[in-house]
Each structure stands twice: as C-alpha cells, then as structure tokens.
C-alpha cells in the first residue's frame, strides 16, 4: 500500500518531536503565503482556505462548524484549547496524532483530547467534517469565538493553561 501524503511529510522529519514536525509544516505553509488575500496559514489567525467550503451554525452555547474538504487537500489546524466532538460524515481522512498517523473512514466520530490538540490532515477522499465547540457567550462573531477556542502558538497555549490553573487555584 503506498504511503499517504502525511506519512511522506513526517518521514522526511524523523528526528523531530511531534510539535516540531507541525511547526516545520507551519513554517512551510507560511512561506507559501503570497499576501493577506492569498494565504495558506500565518500562525496568527484561523484561515478558511477557498478550496474548502464552510458552514457555521450556532445553537445555545454551541458553535457547529461543517467543512467540506476536497480529495487531495491538506490542512493544518490551529491549536485547540478545549476538547470537542469531531464527526467525519463522509470520505476518508488521514490525521496526525502524537501516536502516529490515523486513517479515518466515515462514518466515524470521536472526542478530541482535553486541549492542546493540533492536527495535520489530508483528504484521501472528498470529506465532510463537523466539529462542535463550546460557545459560552453565544457570540456569532467568529473572531471573538476563535479567541476563546484556539491558540495560535504553543507559547500562547501554555499561557492559557497557566492562567486557567491560577484561576482554578484562586477559587
């Protein structure tokens, strides 16, 4: 069986840790960005590339994101601050984890680890992915919601964890 695209990428970085591999991919994606209009990833915000289609839905204290990802496309997620349910409704998707590369075949769902998850994904087939996230303020402003949900660097994530720990200790 031929290796999927993620295995090819990760095999070229054998001595790096998982986070270092993702950082290397992030740096490469940043280098591909031409300008603010033609951006693949910048490590500072959520990017919704044109090759994917998105549907954003809001329910009471929930944000539901549906993404259609075409076959052959690859994407790097931001760092998730919170655990969330992930549903692959159709297609076949390869996704990196700290344990290795998983091949997910729809229909399948799982709950992400409790924060700090970042994934590199590759659509082996056309995919429809749905994720459900907390939205404690019921905002419909994606930029505001993304500040709550995501970190854009591991340093930012560590600051979030440290602040959360201090807040819990002060209760």
Question: What do the PLM-derived regions correspond to, one by one?
Answer:
Residues 118, 122-171:
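Double-stranded beta-helix
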Residues 1-66, 157-171:
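A short, N-terminal "cap"/entry segment at the start of jelly-roll beta-barrel domains
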Residues 80-99:
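Glycine- and acidic-residue-biased ligand/ion/polar-headgroup-sensing regions
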Residues 97-120:
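Short acidic-glycine-tyrosine-enriched beta hairpin
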Residues 62-81, 110:
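Conserved short histidine dyad/triad with adjacent acidic residue
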Residues 70, 80, 88, 114-115, ...:
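A short, compositionally biased micro-patch
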